[in-house]
Design a protein with these regions (language model features):
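Accessible peptide chain termini
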Residues: 1-2, 33
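Extreme N-terminal basic, low-complexity initiation segments
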Residues: 2-8
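Short hydrophobic alpha-helical segments enriched in small aliphatic residues
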Residues: 5, 16, 22-23
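Glycan-recognition and catalytic cores of secretory/periplasmic carbohydrate-active enzymes
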Residues: 14, 32-507
Length: 507
């Protein structure tokens, strides 16, 4: 019991019951002190509630397509995203496939058929408007644009790849098949993979599709082939992965500090200096190494495992930190060395993404070195001041790709790997930050209460911090924030849910 002395007497508190006394000891009145909402420690039920509030907001952005459902990529932006890489209407990254995947996961958690209906409506639109091989024939031969803000349009491999193109959409539909067992879904998923393979270019004993060989470009087809092989056991998907791996092996070069690096994207196309190259997932060596690990899992060919290990050695050779915590620079250069004053922290370009390579190698080899590096990279995020403090490469994007939700997904994964409460505590801290960055409007005519719809607004472009919008999508915006809250709730409850493809291969 706490006693508070006041000028006219005292106040006592016990079990939330407040009693005021005057100087003679006589009680004035009794009040019940309710729990302060800002002091609350969130529970799994809270995270599910927040996710359902998110679904309510996304519903307000819905629109009818030719046969099914789409959602506005950003209802408060005036930009046209129809040909905007990563944000095209049906993309997994920022379009309807990602929103549909979120609704499917929410259906798993709640068993509310309305969410499954939303997911299936998204799938119907994707399937009915699929272009087939014509999409690749058009996309992989696009002419360059001079628009400097969107010069990612000059990267055909990214436009055709998993995050933006049909394979990412088909991943969502493959997950629908796993839950519903509707044969139409697996048929579509196979059709998409077969079309990708049919348009591959052949060189020596390998295949490729574009000049962008990274995990965002040609390399992104490999996790999709791996997913499809797991279900169908069709060896043609293994064969395609092997052939691409053979081609990718030829692009590696010895690194000055050990290991092998892969510079597989020409960054001058997007106005970077010609001497620099990216290091981390999704565009650099750690992403390539992750692809090699997946190819090894499919083929059991040791040369691909060795390549993944070489990629890890390169990352270890340029990492900066101590025995407990490290970060990996954003850029490297054979002329200037690594950018030791510039670090991203989340999934794209940061330790949340690069740790996937070490996690995969630990799963394959059981070697403690790789396990330890997962922990070092994870602790590096915390030592950098995240999740609460932002920095040059960790800004308020509110994106699963490059913001706080990407950290939450990572910490949940490391907690599941280790069972260590240290990483659960990191996840819970990060979840509080994620929730704290969301916005819920005041109820109409009632400032004491709020509406039941939650969204996030962020600056997707690191270099344009004032370009803030609410995005609906999975990797760019609101759906992704709620997705990661469901990840934490599932980990706390010991439940298994569908995963994004990056986390779908771990034991």
């Amino acid at each position: 019991m706490a006693v508070f002395v006041i000028s006219a007497g005292s106040i006592t508190e016990q079990n939330g019951l407040i009693t005021a006394h005057n100087v003679t000891g006589k009680k004035h009145k009794e009040l019940f002190m309710s729990e302060n909402i800002l002091f609350k420690k969130y529970t799994p039920q809270d995270y599910v509630k927040f996710a359902e509030q998110t679904a309510n907001w996304i519903k307000t952005t819905g629109k009818i397509g030719k046969t099914g459902k789409l959602w506005l990529q950003s209802p408060d932006s005036k930009e046209n995203f129809d040909d905007y890489p990563m944000l095209t209407p049906k993309s997994l990254y920022g379009g309807s496939a990602g929103v549909g995947l979120f609704y499917l996961r929410l259906y798993q958690v709640t068993k509310n058929a309305e969410y499954l209906d939303e997911a299936e409506s998204a799938a119907k639109e994707i399937i009915s408007t699929y272009e087939g091989k014509a999409f690749y024939e058009r996309t992989l031969n696009l002419k360059a644009t001079e628009d400097k803000l969107v010069h990612v349009k000059n990267m055909p491999g990214w436009i055709a790849g998993f995050n933006n193109g049909p394979t990412g959409q088909a991943y969502f539909i493959l997950k629908l098949y796993e839950i519903t067992k509707d044969e139409a879904y697996i048929s579509f998923a196979r059709k998409v993979a077969d079309d990708v393979i049919s348009v591959a270019k052949t060189k020596d004993d390998g295949i490729y599709w574009s000049e962008q060989l990274d995990y965002c470009g040609d390399g992104s087809y490999i996790p999709y082939f791996a997913e499809l092989y797991r279900i169908t056991k069709d060896e043609k998907y293994v064969d395609a992965a092997r052939k691409f791996g053979n081609y990718l092996l030829t692009k590696g070069k010895p690194a000055p500090n050990g290991g092998t690096y892969w510079n597989v994207v020409d960054l001058t196309i997007i106005d970077f200096p010609k001497d620099v190259f990216w290091v981390n997932l999704a565009h650099g060596t750690s992403g390539v190494g992750f692809v090699f690990a997946l190819i090894y899992n499919l083929t059991k060919d040791e040369k691909f495992l060795n390549a993944a290990k070489e990629a890890a050695k390169y990352i270890q050779g340029i990492a900066v930190g101590d025995e407990n915590a490290v970060l990996v620079p954003y850029l490297d250069s054979l002329e200037r060395g690594p950018s030791t004053e510039f670090y991203y922290l989340s999934q794209c370009h940061g330790p949340a993404g690069t740790s996937l390579l070490f996690h995969a190698l630990y799963d394959i080899t059981g070697e403690k070195e790789y396990f330890d590096w997962v922990l070092k990279l994870s602790r590096g995020i915390i030592k950098a001041g995240a999740p609460e403090n932002f920095s040059r490469g960790y800004w308020q994007s509110q994106a699963l790709c490059c913001g706080t939700p990407g950290l939450l997904e990572h910490f949940v994964s490391v907690y599941k790997l280790t069972g260590d409460k240290e990483f659960l505590e990191y996840a819970e801290r990060t979840a509080k930050t994620v929730v704290g960055q969301s916005f819920v409007e005041d109820a109409d005519g009632d400032i004491y209460h709020q509406k039941n719809a939650r969204r996030w607004s962020g600056a997707w472009w690191r270099t344009i911090p004032t370009d803030v919008h609410s995005y609906t999508g999975l990797y760019i915006g609101t759906a992704g924030n709620a997705w990661t809250l469901l990840s934490l709730a599932a980990a706390q409850n010991g439940e298994k849910l569908i995963e994004t493809v990056e986390y779908d291969f771990f034991k």
